[in-house]
Every structure is written in C-alpha cells, then in structure tokens.
C-alpha cells in the first residue's frame, strides 16, 4: 500500500518519494516470498497441516475467515486513508491529475471483466467471478518495477501509484455493490448508526484517533453480522478520519494513522493474506484444468485485458488532449506499465474468495488463473520496459 506523500513541494520531496517507493517495493518482494512459500508448503508433506490450520475454528470463525474478514479490514482501512488523502491533497487532487490514471483505471477494469465474461457466458455457477481480473496488486507491481531500478522514470511510478488508488476504489465499490450476501436489517441499522457516530466525531472536530478506532471496531462487528463484507468497515472508518488543513499537516490524524499502519500492512497483513490464500495443491492440475473457463478467463483477463484496457484508454485520453504522457516517459514504457498492471494478486484472490463461497474447487481454479496471469504479466512488463528504456 501507499505511504503518505507530501502535500506541498519541498526540497526533500524527491527524496521522500524515493524512500516511499523503496518501502513499497520491499513490501511487494515480501509478498512474493509469502506467495511462493504458500505454494511450496501446500505441495509438500506439510500440505495437509497447512490446509487444516486455515480451517481451524477460533472464536466462531475459521483462521482463514479471521484473515480475510479481520486482518484485511486493516488493509482496506489503509486503502480508504490513501483514497481520501490523494483525492483531497495528493496525486488525484485536481481533474487534470486524475485524467490519465482515471481513464487508464476504467479501461483496466472493464476489458478484463469483459474477457472473463466472454469465457464464462452461460455458466451461472462461474459468471459471478467477472470482477476477479479487474484489480491490480500495487505492492507486487512496484516490487517488480523496482527490479528495473533507474531505467523507469519516477513519473511512471507515480502514474502507477495513482492508477492503483483508483483501481482500489473501483474494487471497493464492486465488493460493496455485487458481493454482499443476505442482509440482516437490525445489524445493518446498527452499522449505519456507527457510521453516523464516526461522521459526528469528524464534524465535531475530534482529532484523537482512539474514539474513531473504538467506533470502527463496533462498525466492523455490525458489518460482519449484517451481510455486508466486514472489510468495508475499514474503508468507512478511514473516510471519516480527519485529514486536517495543510498548515496542520504535522498534527493530521489521517497522515499519522496512515504512517503507522503502512509497515504493518506491507510487511504483515498482506504477506499473511498471501500465504493463507496463494496455497493451492497442484496435484490435481492438468492441461484440461488450465483451459477451463474460470482459470482461462482470469489469466487472459489479467494478461491481455489489463494491458489492452489500460493502454488503449490512456492513449485515447492523450490523443484527445485530455491528458499527457508522464514526464520523461515514452509510449513503450507506458505500455510496459500497463502490462505490469496485470499482476492482480491480492485483490484478485480476495474477490475470488467472495465470488465462490462454498466452492473450494472454483477458488483453486481462480488461484491458478491469478498466478499464471500475474507471472506472465510481470515477465511481459519487465521485457517491454527493459526494451524501451534503452531507447527512452
């Protein structure tokens, strides 16, 4: 996830952004290691113990549910903090800044979804996974981008970060609108009451974080019981935490919380999620499995849909005069970044688990598709960026 960026230019701005991307890429590398470890363990003699541990029940929920509904609420809270900061005072603060990543994010969500739907049309048991290839994993993408060092201009990394913020926003809306189960009206009303309390705290000018966190914990519980996915409590909480005025940046509750959360999310929450969700037994995977509609739709949605959707919409915006290429970059480098956006690991796996509850065989197929599509996208992106870095 993304650490806070300065809201005003300063002599140290470049150094700050450089440190930010170094930390981001480091988190991506840790996530890669966790995913690889999960695959190794799941296909070793420890595989049965690995899956048994994930299904062990603690306080009424399995370990897997605690990770996906509990820990990931912290991940989504950081997503919400980033969205609010960037829209109010960051890379998305003006319409001109939003244009290129906005068009790119739209194309990068629509085309992969259409590709998945094309492969799963007429299959009511699998069509609900249409949103799986629509997300980009920013930590993974920046981790891969870091392997290229100075071959990639900083402006492209900022573009990728802004695109990912809008991509995350789209994923949050998709989860809220399309992956909500049967609702409990009393619990939903209690959740709405909690949100009203958070808004009241904000309007009253409360700057202490503790009251927000206490009400946020209640909101998480009510959402868990209501049928709305509990992770959205993290987003709602984040959007109510005050950013403060530019001259109060040192005392900004939002920036303070974001700074504290970032290392925990990057180096604990997301790697734990990756380790718990990337493990899939390959013993039953055959050539026929790879061409099943779900893994094929997911893999091609990420590999083909992401790069085509992002590059085509970005090019359209640039040619129409609505946006311009990131400073110091060329068309080939923009295409390379679009290919890297096919790395859809964390959010794709998360949406896959929501799309097919109670269907572990389909979730395993999603994992195969996500892994294949993400790895091939990473390889293609690196090859393209290395090729065009020599010319640009």
From Swiss-Prot:
Give GO terms for biological process: regulation of pH
Tell me, in one coarse class, where this protein mainly resides.
membrane
Which Gene3D superfamilies did the record assign? Na+/H+ antiporter like domain (1.20.1530.10)
Provide GO CC annotations from the record. Answer: plasma membrane
Write out the transmembrane intervals: 20-40, 61-81, 99-119, 127-147, 158-178, 181-201, 209-229, 265-285, 298-318, 336-356, 365-385
UniProt-listed InterPro entries:
Na/H_antiporter_dom_sf, NhaA
Q: List the disulfide bonds.
A: none
Compartment(s) where it occurs, according to its Swiss-Prot or TrEMBL record: Cell inner membrane
Q: Which domain of life is it from?
A: Bacteria
The answer to keyword Transport applying to this record is yes
Quote one Gene Ontology molecular function term. sodium:proton antiporter activity
Q: Which HAMAP family match?
A: NhaA (MF_01844)
Instruction: Tell me the function of this protein.
Output: Na(+)/H(+) antiporter that extrudes sodium in exchange for external protons.
PANTHER family tied to this protein: NA(+)_H(+) ANTIPORTER NHAA, SODIUM ION/PROTON ANTIPORTER NHAA-RELATED
What NCBIfam families does the record point to?
NhaA, PRK09560.1, PRK09561.1
Q: What's the family?
A: Belongs to the NhaA Na(+)/H(+) (TC 2.A.33) antiporter family.
- Name under which the protein is recorded: Na(+)/H(+) antiporter NhaA 2
Q: Which organism does this record belong to? A: Pseudomonas syringae pv. syringae (strain B728a)
């Amino acid at each position: 996830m993304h650490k806070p960026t300065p809201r005003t230019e300063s002599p140290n701005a470049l150094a700050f952004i450089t440190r930010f991307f170094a930390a981001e890429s480091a988190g991506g590398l840790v996530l890669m290691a966790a995913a690889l470890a999960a695959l190794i363990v799941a296909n070793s003699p420890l595989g049965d113990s690995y899956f048994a541990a994930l299904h062990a029940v603690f306080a009424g929920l399995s370990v897997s549910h605690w990770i996906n509904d509990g820990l990931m609420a912290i991940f989504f809270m950081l997503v919400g903090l980033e969205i609010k900061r960037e829209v109010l005072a960051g890379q998305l603060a003006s319409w001109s800044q939003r244009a290129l990543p906005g068009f790119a994010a739209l194309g990068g969500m629509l085309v992969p979804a259409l590709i998945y739907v094309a492969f799963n049309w007429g299959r009511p048991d699998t069509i609900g996974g249409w949103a799986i290839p629509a997300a980009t994993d920013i930590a993974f993408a920046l981790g891969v981008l870091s392997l290229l060092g100075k071959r990639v201009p900083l402006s492209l990394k900022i573009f990728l970060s802004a695109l990912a913020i809008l991509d995350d926003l789209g994923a949050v809306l998709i989860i809220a609108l399309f992956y909500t189960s049967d609702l409990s009206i009393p619990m939903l009303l209690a959740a709405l009451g909690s949100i009203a309390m958070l808004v009241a705290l904000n309007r009253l000018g409360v700057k202490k974080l503790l009251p927000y966190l206490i009400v946020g914990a209640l909101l998480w519980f009510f959402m868990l019981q209501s049928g709305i996915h509990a992770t959205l409590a993290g987003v709602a909480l984040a959007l109510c935490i005050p950013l403060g005025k530019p001259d109060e940046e040192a005392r900004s509750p939002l920036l303070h919380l974001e700074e504290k959360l970032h290392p925990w999310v990057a180096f604990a929450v997301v790697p734990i999620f990756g380790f718990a969700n990337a493990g899939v037994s390959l013993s039953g995977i055959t050539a026929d499995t790879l061409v099943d509609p779900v893994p094929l739709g997911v893999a091609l949605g990420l590999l083909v849909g992401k790069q085509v959707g992002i590059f085509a919409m970005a090019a359209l915006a640039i040619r129409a005069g609505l946006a311009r290429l990131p400073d110091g970059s060329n068309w080939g480098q923009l295409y390379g970044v679009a290919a890297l956006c096919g790395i859809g690991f964390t959010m794709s796996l998360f949406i896959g688990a929501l799309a097919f509850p109670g269907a572990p065989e389909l979730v395993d197929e999603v994992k195969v598709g996500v892994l294949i599509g993400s790895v091939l996208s990473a390889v293609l992106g690196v090859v393209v960026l290395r090729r065009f870095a020599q010319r640009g």
